[in-house]
């Protein structure tokens, strides 16, 4: 500024200024010829053309090598899917444009596949907040800022990114689309697409069929030479549009290196400026292309061995009966014998299956208590006077009705030493439990003289017991 003022005072001519409307401000015929020589003939032809046209070196050595390697036949590139978005009208014949740098497109912005929030209200004054990496005092890191804003979105997430290899951010986008049902648009650079597809495959995310996620490819501007050679640029725009209300834009790429190693900055914008980013995203969406077809699934290989095909995976179901072999040619008797159905082998009977199941079944509960037989009762009667502990056992045995007693009552022999009579009615019923004092176990001395005599000695003569009843059985008659 001071130098120009000093030159104006001294009257020194600083040279003619190129106006912005002049073609020479953005276009150079010498640079175009040099670039055509680079794409068609190589780096040596490019240097020769630069010297012949007396141009300043406008390409570095790395740019020269990159452009020469990226050059391709534009007739092959033209066969790729059209970059027009869904809803836009196209024609087979490219009519071109009447102006070299058209200011506006004749076609309206296309309708996006997952919808787009429309809010015509004024969003307020534009406000900006700067975040850096490494973070400043009291500020979150750039990756944390982006993740928090994505997790807080509830209407829309639209991402334009050059390199996308961060798994955490991809999982956040998938979670927003599938769980919170937030439309997610993702526009990626064409040259960096293989890295993103590899990341999605490792995470088990299908970018072609993930619900509520639209992934498309964007390429930079193209230069086409007269020798059918073409070179395309990359996408350097990086911003995230959230709910149509907030925008995160800056130098941060969705990579681990940008989150941990590289220095960068982003700006969180709100207000009226968001409408400009919304228009830019829809413009890029209109120029984008769908993803290339998904590669066929390869059989998985574990430890150098190819895993066989699972028999439980059914690729196609057909309701077709199995074809029977054709009948052999010959006499009618042979053909009838071939068509005769052979008798089926008889299977096991139901009773055999039930017995096998019962044998194989293991008891899950406590073992069943064995029943008392008549032999057990006679054995207990022999041990009646042994000890006090045995008396308790005798009482427990005498106070319970066992299957042996029930069998003896049914046969008329009685379940006790006195020959109990079956007191059930003729039509049947439950067996009553006998009183405990009526069940007596005889000691060896009592068995020697007889049970009845011993019982009579214990009671006064001529006195009839109050609970005496006619008994039938061994040694007792009514």
Swiss-Prot record:
Residues 292-334, 359-436, 452-478 are annotated as: Disordered. The gene is FAM83E. GO terms for molecular function: protein kinase binding. This is Protein FAM83E. Belongs to the FAM83 family. GO terms for biological process: signal transduction. Directly interacts (via DUF1669) with CSNK1A1, CSNK1A1L, CSNK1D and CSNK1E. May interact with RAF1. Keywords: Cytoplasm. InterPro entries: FAM83, SACK1. May play a role in MAPK signaling. Residues 309-319 have a biased composition (Basic residues). It holds the Pfam family SACK1. All members of the FAM83 family of proteins share a conserved N-terminal DUF1669 (domain of unknown function 1669) domain of about 300 amino acids. This domain mediates the interaction with casein kinase 1 (CK1) isoforms. Therefore, it has been proposed to rename DUF1669 the polypeptide anchor of CK1 domain. Residues 379-388 have a biased composition (Polar residues).
